[in-house]
């Protein structure tokens, strides 16, 4: 209390000091004011004052004291504005600079806040005046604490500003809660005790115990005892009025004469030894005596730890009457009085030596994170406690310390290091289905790579200076437990580049016959060439264009030329000799072109043959008119051979027939067509064929700068050369001579390349050898080994140095010393020491030299081999110290003497047999009758023989299914990536328990069992989602322009058992996965080809002129378009039907001598299309009319431009992105999304891209973009940990656990992590042996009726199965031989204790009650956080009313506890019995208590009415008022008392069956108003809905249900009739409809 009061006083003093400051300031200001007033007559008050700003930051060169901080100081007017410094008094100017402490970051380790403990919660003064009538939760309070900044190493205060630099100052005060007052709560009374007297008048009592102590100022506990007078049968004899009482034993003391007697005895002994030494002259005898003395001296040295002294103690024996007053011993009639003396051991407290020096600090280095270590000092026991209950103080003391000296080295720091990543592997990402059907050799795309981690000492190079360069490159690994930081990732996603196949354009048309090199035209050898180009460069494989097909083909030809004239168009036909008609010529307009068809300078064609003019005929008015020749058709064959010959045709038609007179007649039909040969070159095509590039070989001609790579990655690689084979190949034949192919176009055969860098194997140095066991070996004969290892951090590559040395080495440890086990050696008991005869000689009946006494013995510490050992070793390893003293008996003449017990006889027979042991009476005891009493002194003891019947039975649940453990594969230090075995056949286990015939648990080996039942089990393997192969791509959805093509997969099998989930399925058809990509169809792939119009066939033939209106036709065919022009006829549906030219038309055949004009030219329409504009076409006159009066008509047609009819706009359109496209060999990773560019006409039709290109429209959209398909990474788990220690050291419920962790979470559609991350397995059943106290014996007072006595108890070895329900069963003590002697957690074994047997008439305290349940302080079931409390109590027992004034106070004891609960108290009432009932308070766990319930809310226990309810048909209600029974109404008086109960009238409803109006149904009508009968007759019902009991009949419910169904039916019909039916919708789907599968719609899909 003193300490607590002191703590409470200190903050109050601080508060007072804080309050003093403003008071002093007020006094100073008031005195200053008075002084100013006094001087007001002589001195004018100043109008200017000095003002100061806050102190700035502490500045200085060094950390710590010595810094300087400044602040601003200025002069200001009293109104606040700043003025000149000269206006203020300079003498009182404040300082603008002061010294300060400069805080640096490293001060954080030296300074910190010291937080004091919170003081007691004090009520807030302002709130305490407003206390409510009823406390609900508690009273608000406040508590304070002391906080100071300290220098940690010196433990001295420092300025607060230093600590505030790093952390704000913690709160000095906080709100707290003072709970409501809690009154004492007690239990119900126990039953009444028996009467205190067996006859006559006595007392009986009953007690109760405390359930909850008073808290927070609550009221105290009521009396825990009630007593009442009881009457028994009258006493036949006088009851004894006196009792013999023994007092407590005195303290153990040593007789006064002992020291003198010992001194005399020592003197005599020395004289005897001297004489004996003189007498003994034999050297051997002297040696024996010397050894014995040394041994005795050692024993005495060991025994000095105990220094046992045996003394004596006495007690008083008095005779008491019933009032507790002493009387003469003669009144207590007894044959033999109790002993008043006995031998005892002098109590010795534990004594220890002085502390030894502190050990060196465990932290010998400097560590910033944990700078402190520990140091230890010890002391030893110099005197062990004897007869004392106090334990020895601690023999070891630890305290934190810091390594001393400035030269302390840095502590070793550790960190994780990693090996290089392994190659990227795609196969771990494959599903089960892909692994079975895929060729895994050429996989690419997203993959997984792994690496190992190992721990190293990161500052090893700083701590050791003699490291070699190799050691610095790679540090040696250390134990992984030393690295505490986050573990680096051991798995990551990677990417294997996918090879991109070479894509080429279509072949161009065959070019003209040209030299292979126009710059070198030696010889006449020429070639016709056709080419194609690479549209998509290949990657991967052999690289560059090695995988591309040949890009050029050649055909030998004759008469090559590099340049030639090309006819552009023919001029008009000019008649000869200036005539207007007749034969003439047409001049060709030509340009000079090269072999690629490009227009060049005309000078280059100077060697070429210039085209000559073409002969023609300008028709005269009466001549036949023919149309111009059509263009030559495509060549029928690309080359000419023996069976094939290329041909081209062209045709013309008759436009007008000739007149009958003098005109040139039209030619026959054969003259209207011309045929010529084409592609006359032979069908022998040659090309250069290239082989793959060879291996890159170092080129010695290039200076080598290759170096071997090191771990730091600094390397350079040399240049090499690659070659490949190039041959000339004839198509469809094979290799031919190289002269057949154009030499100048031969591909290169050699190219430079970079040699891959050589990488040597890099291995860490060996780790240190693992430590051998430093402690001694206990029974483990297995050879101990130590090992070391190293880690490959870089695998060799490209011809680097291989890893050859072993990665793991081990060697045998040196044999550790064998552990010494220690034991206590007990020596012979010394002689039995009695109480000195000088003490007991005055006691009546005492006999000298016999009786009870006490004897001691020496104990020493020995090794198992018998060698000497320190007493400290046995105290630590040899178990409890044997008894040093024991009671002994020197038999007197009247005592019975027996031989020692014999050994037990052998067991013969089955279970249930017994064995015996015997003893016999010795000497004069044979003649004493009392010694022959077998009840007092049994001569035979029996015990049951051990029984060997055992039965085994399973206990507990089955374990998880456990797979057999496999071995981890390690290859050159790099872990192999692969799935570990997680499914298949395993075993599950159930523990077996073995019991003997008495139901006691024994070792399972007794039942010939290894402790388990094994049962095979199956862990189902996960099955991934299985889809079909991709279907073929559908046709492009559009035949012209950009469309889409689709392929799909169907669902074949759903995933189960944690397999990979299915990808996101189509929302329409849940059984399919679609992939959609854009596609492009060339609009000119198929074109309409027309032949010339036929001759106009006149409908009404004028035989004379053969002219007039008619019809002409032509053939229209759909043909496939190629680079060489239309090639072959195809089906018409492949061409666009909207663009199909007309096959017939009306025509007009001119009459002779009429004007003849040519075919109409193309329409001209300027773009962009202007609706206000027009377009036109024209034709040229071919034959002039004979009559000049009949001129040729205007050969121009005009029509307005109409958008989307004869004039169009064009624009680019971009399709949607495709799905992410991966390589066929890829599972995931980087891919490409593509889209197409489309040229769309304004009417929405896709047309050829050339229409948009001719307009020069912008096209800035990217057509490709990169994308990523998330990789399906399966969940990767660590290996199972080792099995943990059993959760229970014994019993049935022990479990072993092993765990695993997720090393790589699943990603994407990878296999998810299993839920089972922990497995349990039952432990083998072991019996639980422990020591257990027996019950205390009754308090035994030796040969007296009351007073101080003793009670004893035994300890026994018991076995149980560890469960709370199992009752422990006693077994032989040998089973507990290896069990430490601890009972209820206490090593101090108490088998005997003093007790008090109350004398008749005494008033005394009963035994302590059991500790109550742990109870928390709660409000509405919520803990307030004040901790739990338990209580026990002692009640007062009264035996005589006259002795009440001698009664002690009842006792209460509390203690704090942790596992508390919230309890509620509420009133409970029984059912009313008449006008009364019982009401009691009950706790929420069902215990009836007194106190705890609020008195104001206690229910009534009596409900009788006053005055009583005497009126007929009335009763007393719960509200204690008179009420009427049912069917009656109350009539109240003016003073609100019941006067009478009036019958309530009823309405009679007559029925058909009974015209007399029997009462069928009665209903009260306004029970508080008079009944009024309605006028008229009562209505008669033929169907009565109510039965005789007033309830509805069954048929009424049926009618109601039928009516409801009918109503629902009518409403439904109305709704269906009025509802407007939906129009059937026809869905159009251009996509190919796939074959559907049955699918059950599982949510996991």
UniProtKB/Swiss-Prot annotation:
Q: Which cysteines are joined by disulfide bonds?
A: 424-494, 444-498, 455-483, 624-666, 635-639, 678-683, 696-753, 717-757, 728-741, 761-803, 772-776, 813-819, 961-1017, 983-1021, 994-1007, 1025-1062, 1036-1040, 1079-1083, 1201-1207, 1220-1267, 1228-1271, 1239-1252, 1275-1313, 1286-1290, 1323-1328, 1339-1395, 1346-1399, 1357-1376, 1403-1447, 1414-1418, 1457-1462
The record's Gene Ontology cellular component field reads:
extracellular region; plasma membrane; podocyte foot
Which residue spans belong to the Cytoplasmic compartment? 1617-1645
Query: Any ranges marked Extracellular in the topology annotation, and which?
Result: 39-1595
The organism is: Mus musculus (Mouse)
> Which PROSITE patterns does the record cross-reference, listed alphabetically?
TSP1 (PS50092)
Spell out the post-translational modification annotation for this entry: Proteolytic cleavage in the extracellular region generates a 210 kDa soluble form.
Q: What note about domains is in the entry?
A: Sequence analysis combined with the expression of constructs corresponding each to two or three adjacent TSP type-1 domains suggests the presence of 21 TSP type-1 domains; not all of these are detected by standard bioinformatic tools.
Q: Which residues form a coiled coil?
A: 256-304
Compositionally biased spans, kind Basic and acidic residues = 270-288
What tissue specificity does the UniProt entry give?
Answer: Detected on kidney podocytes along the glomerular capillary wall (at protein level).
Q: Where is the composition biased (Basic residues)?
A: 258-269, 289-298
Keyword annotations from UniProtKB, A to Z? Angiogenesis, Cell membrane, Cell projection, Coiled coil, Differentiation, Disulfide bond, Glycoprotein, Membrane, Repeat, Secreted, Signal, Transmembrane, Transmembrane helix
| GO terms classed as biological process | actin cytoskeleton organization; angiogenesis; cell differentiation
| Every TSP type-1 domain range | 46-105, 109-181, 183-236, 349-405, 412-499, 501-563, 623-684, 685-758, 760-820, 821-893, 895-948, 949-1022, 1024-1084, 1085-1152, 1154-1208, 1209-1272, 1274-1329, 1330-1400, 1402-1463
Q: What Pfam families does the record tag this protein with?
A: TSP1_ADAMTS, TSP1_spondin, TSP1_TSH7A-B_C, TSP_1
Q: What Gene3D superfamilies does its record include?
A: Thrombospondin type-1 (TSP1) repeat
Signal sequence span per UniProt?
1-38
Which residues are modified by glycosylation? 223, 321, 439, 489, 668, 706, 957, 1032, 1213, 1264, 1354, 1488, 1535
Q: Where are the transmembrane segments?
A: 1596-1616
Residue span of region Disordered: 255-300
Q: What is this protein called?
A: Thrombospondin type-1 domain-containing protein 7A
């Amino acid at each position: 209390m003193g300490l607590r009061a002191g703590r409470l006083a200190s903050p109050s003093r601080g508060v007072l000091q804080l309050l003093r400051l403003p008071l002093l300031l007020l006094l100073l200001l008031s005195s200053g004011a008075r002084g100013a007033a006094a001087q007001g007559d002589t001195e004018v008050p100043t109008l200017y004052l000095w003002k100061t700003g806050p102190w700035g930051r502490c500045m200085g060169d060094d950390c710590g004291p010595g810094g300087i901080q400044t602040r601003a100081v200025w002069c200001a007017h009293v109104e606040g504005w700043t003025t000149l410094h000269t206006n203020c008094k300079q003498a009182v100017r404040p300082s603008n600079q002061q010294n300060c402490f400069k805080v640096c970051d490293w001060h954080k380790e030296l300074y910190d806040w010291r937080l004091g403990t919170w003081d007691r919660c004090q009520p807030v003064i302002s709130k305490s005046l407003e206390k409510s009538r009823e406390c609900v939760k508690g009273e608000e309070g406040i508590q304070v604490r002391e906080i100071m900044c300290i220098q940690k190493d010196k433990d001295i205060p420092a300025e607060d500003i230093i600590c505030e630099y790093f952390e704000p100052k913690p709160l000095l005060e906080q709100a707290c809660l003072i709970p409501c007052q809690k009154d004492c709560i007690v239990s119900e009374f126990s039953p009444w005790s028996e009467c205190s007297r067996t006859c006559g008048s006595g007392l009986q009592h009953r007690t109760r115990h405390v359930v909850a102590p008073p808290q927070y100022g609550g009221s105290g506990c009521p009396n825990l005892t009630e007593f009442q007078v009881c009457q028994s049968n009258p006493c036949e004899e006088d009851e004894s009025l006196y009792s013999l009482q023994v007092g407590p034993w005195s303290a153990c003391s040593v007789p006064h004469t002992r020291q003198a007697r010992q001194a005399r005895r020592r003197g005599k002994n020395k004289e005897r030894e001297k004489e004996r030494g003189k007498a003994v002259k034999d050297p051997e005898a002297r040696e024996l005596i010397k050894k014995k003395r040394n041994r005795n001296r050692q024993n005495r040295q060991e025994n000095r730890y105990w220094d046992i002294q045996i003394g004596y103690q006495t007690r008083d024996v008095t005779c008491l009457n019933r009032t507790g007053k002493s009387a003469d011993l003669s009144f207590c009639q007894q044959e033999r009085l109790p002993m008043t003396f006995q031998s005892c051991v002098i109590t010795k407290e534990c004594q220890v030596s002085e502390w030894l020096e502190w050990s060196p600090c465990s932290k010998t280095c400097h560590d910033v994170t944990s700078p402190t270590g520990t140091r230890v000092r010890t002391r030893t026991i110099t005197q062990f406690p004897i007869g004392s209950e106090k334990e020895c103080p601690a023999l070891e003391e630890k305290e934190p310390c810091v390594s001393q000296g400035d030269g302390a080295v840095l502590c070793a720091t550790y960190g994780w290091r990693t090996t290089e990543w392994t190659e990227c592997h795609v196969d771990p990402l494959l599903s089960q289905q892909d692994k079975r059907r895929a060729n895994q050799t050429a996989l690419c795309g997203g993959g997984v790579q792994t690496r190992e981690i190992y721990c190293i000492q990161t500052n090893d190079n700083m701590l050791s200076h003699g490291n070699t360069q190799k050691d610095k490159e790679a540090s040696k690994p250390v134990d992984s437990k030393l690295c505490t930081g986050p573990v680096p990732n051991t798995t990551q996603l990677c990417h294997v580049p996918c090879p991109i196949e070479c894509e080429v354009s279509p072949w161009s048309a065959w070019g003209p016959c040209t030299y292979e090199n126009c710059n070198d035209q030696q010889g006449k050898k020429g070639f016709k060439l056709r080419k194609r180009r690479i549209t998509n460069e290949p990657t991967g494989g052999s690289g560059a264009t090695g995988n591309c097909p040949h890009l050029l083909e050649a055909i030998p030809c004759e008469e090559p030329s590099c340049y030639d004239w090309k006819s552009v168009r023919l001029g008009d036909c000019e008649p000869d000799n200036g005539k207007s008609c007749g034969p003439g010529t047409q001049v060709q307009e030509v340009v000079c072109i090269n072999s690629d068809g490009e227009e060049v300078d005309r000078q280059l064609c100077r060697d070429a043959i210039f085209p000559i003019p073409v002969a023609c005929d300008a028709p005269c008015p009466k001549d036949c008119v023919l149309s111009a020749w059509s263009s030559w058709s495509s060549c029928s064959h690309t080359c000419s051979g023996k069976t094939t010959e290329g041909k081209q045709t062209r045709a013309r038609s008759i436009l007008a027939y000739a007149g009958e007179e003098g005109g040139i007649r039209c030619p026959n039909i054969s003259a209207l067509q011309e045929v010529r040969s084409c592609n006359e070159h032979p069908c022998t095509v040659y090309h250069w064929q290239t082989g793959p590039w060879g291996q890159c070989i170092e080129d010695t001609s290039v200076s080598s700068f290759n170096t071997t790579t090191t771990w730091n990655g600094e390397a350079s690689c040399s240049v090499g050369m690659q070659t490949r084979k190039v041959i000339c190949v004839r198509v469809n034949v094979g290799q031919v001579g190289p002269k057949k192919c154009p030499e100048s176009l031969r591909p290169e055969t050699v190219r430079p390349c970079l040699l891959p860098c050589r990488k040597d194997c890099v291995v860490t140095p060996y780790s240190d050898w693992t430590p051998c066991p430093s402690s001694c070996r206990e029974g483990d004969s297995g050879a101990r080994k130590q090992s070391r290892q190293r880690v490959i951090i870089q695998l060799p590559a490209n011809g680097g140095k291989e890893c050859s040395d072993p990665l793991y080495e081990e060697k045998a440890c040196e044999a550790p010393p064998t552990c010494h086990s220690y034991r206590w050696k007990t020596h012979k008991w010394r002689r039995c020491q009695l109480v000195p005869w000088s003490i007991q000689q005055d006691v009546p009946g005492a006999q000298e030299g016999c009786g009870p006494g006490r004897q001691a013995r020496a104990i020493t510490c020995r090794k198992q081999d018998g060698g000497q050992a320190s007493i400290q070793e046995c105290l630590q390893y040899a178990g409890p110290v044997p008894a040093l003293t024991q009671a002994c008996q020197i038999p007197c003449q009247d005592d019975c003497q027996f031989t020692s017990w014999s050994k037990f006889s052998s067991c013969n027979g089955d279970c249930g047999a017994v064995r015996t042991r015997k003893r016999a009476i010795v000497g004069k005891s044979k003649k004493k009758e009392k010694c022959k009493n077998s009840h007092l002194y049994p001569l035979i003891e029996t015990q049951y023989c051990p029984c060997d019947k055992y039965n085994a039975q399973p206990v507990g649940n089955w374990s998880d299914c456990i797979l057999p453990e496999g071995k981890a594969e390690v290859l050159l230090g790099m872990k192999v990536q692969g799935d570990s075995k997680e499914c298949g056949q395993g075993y599950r286990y159930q523990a077996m328990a073995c019991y003997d015939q008495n139901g006691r648990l024994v070792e399972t080996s007794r039942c010939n069992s290894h402790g388990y039942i094994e049962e095979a089990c199956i862990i189902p393997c996960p099955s991934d989602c299985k889809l079909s192969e991709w279907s073929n791509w559908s046709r492009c959805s559009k035949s012209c322009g950009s469309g889409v093509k689709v392929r799909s997969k169907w669902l074949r099998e759903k995933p189960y058992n944690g397999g990979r989930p299915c990808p996101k399925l189509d929302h329409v058809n849940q059984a399919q996965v679609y992939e959609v990509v854009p596609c492009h169809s060339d609009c000119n792939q198929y074109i309409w080809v027309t032949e010339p119009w036929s001759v106009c066939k006149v409908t009404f033939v004028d035989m004379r002129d053969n002219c007039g209106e008619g019809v002409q036709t032509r053939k229209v065919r759909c043909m496939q378009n190629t680079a060489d022009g239309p090639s072959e006829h195809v089906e018409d549906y492949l061409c666009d039907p909207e663009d199909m030219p007309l096959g017939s038309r009306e025509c007009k055949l001119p009459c002779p001598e009429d004007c003849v004009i040519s075919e109409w030219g193309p329409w001209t329409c300027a773009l962009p299309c202007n609706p206000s504009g027009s377009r036109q076409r024209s034709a040229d006159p071919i034959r002039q009319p004979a009559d000049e009066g009949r001129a040729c008509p205007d050969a121009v047609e005009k029509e307005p431009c109409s958008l989307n009819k004869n004039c169009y706009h064009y624009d680019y359109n971009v399709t949607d992105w495709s799905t992410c496209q991966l390589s066929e060999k890829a599972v995931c990773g980087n891919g490409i999304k593509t889209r197409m560019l489309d040229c769309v006409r304004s009417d929405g039709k896709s047309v050829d891209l050339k229409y948009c290109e001719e307009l020069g429209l912008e096209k800035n959209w990217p057509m490709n973009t990169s994308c990523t398909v998330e990789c399906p990474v399966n969940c990767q788990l660590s290996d199972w940990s080792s099995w943990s220690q059993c959760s229970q050291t014994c019993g049935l419920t022990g479990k072993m656990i092993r765990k695993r962790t997720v090393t790589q979470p699943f990603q994407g559609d990878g296999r998810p992590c299993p839920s089972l991350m922990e497995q349990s397995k039952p432990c083998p059943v072991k019996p639980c042996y422990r020591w257990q106290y027996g019950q205390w014996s009754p308090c035994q007072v030796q040969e007296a009726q009351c007073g101080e006595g003793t009670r004893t108890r035994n300890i026994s070895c018991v076995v149980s199965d560890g469960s709370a329900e199992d009752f422990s069963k006693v077994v032989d003590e040998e089973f507990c031989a290896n069990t430490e002697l601890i009972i209820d957690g206490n090593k101090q074994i108490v088998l005997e204790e003093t007790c008090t047997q109350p004398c008749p008439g005494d008033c005394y305290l009963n035994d302590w009650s059991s500790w109550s349940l742990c109870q928390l302080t709660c409000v509405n079931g919520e803990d307030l956080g004040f901790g739990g409390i338990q209580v026990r109590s002692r009640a007062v027992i009264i035996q005589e009313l006259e002795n009440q004034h001698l009664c002690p106070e009842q006792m209460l004891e509390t203690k704090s506890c942790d596992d508390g609960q919230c309890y509620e108290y509420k009133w409970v009432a029984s059912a009313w019995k008449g006008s009364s009932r019982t009401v009691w308070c009950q706790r929420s766990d069902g215990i009836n208590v007194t106190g705890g319930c609020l008195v104001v809310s206690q229910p009534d226990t009596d409900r009788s009415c006053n005055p009583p309810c005497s009126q007929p048909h009335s009763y007393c209600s719960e509200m204690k008022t008179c009420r009427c029974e049912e069917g009656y109404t109350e009539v109240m008086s003016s003073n609100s008392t019941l006067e009478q109960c009036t019958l309530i009238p009823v309405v009679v409803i007559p029925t058909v069956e009974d015209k007399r109006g029997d009462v069928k149904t009665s209903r009260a009508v306004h029970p508080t108003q008079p009944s009024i009968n309605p006028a008229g007759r009562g209505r008669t019902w033929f169907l009565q809905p109510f039965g005789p009991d007033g309830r509805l009949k069954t048929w009424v419910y049926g009618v109601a249900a039928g009516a409801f169904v009918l109503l629902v039916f009518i409403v439904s019909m109305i709704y269906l009739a009025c509802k407007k039916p939906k129009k059937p919708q026809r869905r159009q789907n251009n996509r190919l409809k796939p074959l559907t599968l049955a699918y059950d719609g599982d949510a996991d899909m």
